[in-house]
């Protein structure tokens, strides 16, 4: 039986974990809730405990059967894995790859910005296979971007390369983004941004809509489901969301000129 490896995608709502062959074949996947309270101190211990439990279930030994782990973090990551601040998780002054390695008995762990490593994965095994230059955008709790040129991740001097979610796209915004800016793409085209746009649209219109039954608890999924069903207000929300996403992607395309 060959060595295995582990992939960890830390999101603002959940952490998705996969067990793989070193060839990239997925053997199992599962997730745990992202506990962001108290500065996110429980996130990595929860991940480590979940990995140990899964390995035990499969009769695998952490030290003998696992070659290492790769981890995606929703924010800027320095080349050595250091994270100065990750607002979506509450982290400050943390090296998550060192901490997760410590919690997993010292196995090798490498971390990077989630969208960057997702783009790398797509180039290796997914929709970007066969391409040397690509841009990937991730839409979740936030908006991330990964840029690969000549098969190399463009992370930048401070790990901020590809932070597409914080491109300024909207001049009529008045609330601050998590990054401290105003008018960022993430404020309108992320899952949380879609829900917020829906609440704003409901507040300024008397138009009937299936979204009204959810009130302030409306989610991005509710909006998407209603839009697919032809709900006029939901379609209006998605038109706004898509407009700003397209505006940002056009800027990126003109800047880096990717193949895909």
Regions found by a protein language model. Give the residues of each.
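Adenylate-forming
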Residues: 118-124, 145-147, 166-167
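ATP-binding/phosphotransfer module of carbohydrate and carboxylate kinases, centering on a glycine-rich
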Residues: 1-68, 77-80, 98-109, 121-131, ...
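Short, active-site-adjacent cap segments at secondary-structure transitions
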Residues: 75-79, 116-119, 144
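Short hydrophobic alpha-helix segments
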Residues: 30-32, 87, 157
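Short loop/edge segments at beta-strand edges and connector loops
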Residues: 111-113
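A charged helix-plus-loop insertion that forms the helical arch/lid used to bind
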Residues: 82-92
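Short beta-strand segments
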Residues: 9, 68-74, 136-142, 146-148
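Structural signature of FAD isoalloxazine-binding scaffolds in flavoprotein oxidoreductases
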Residues: 160-164
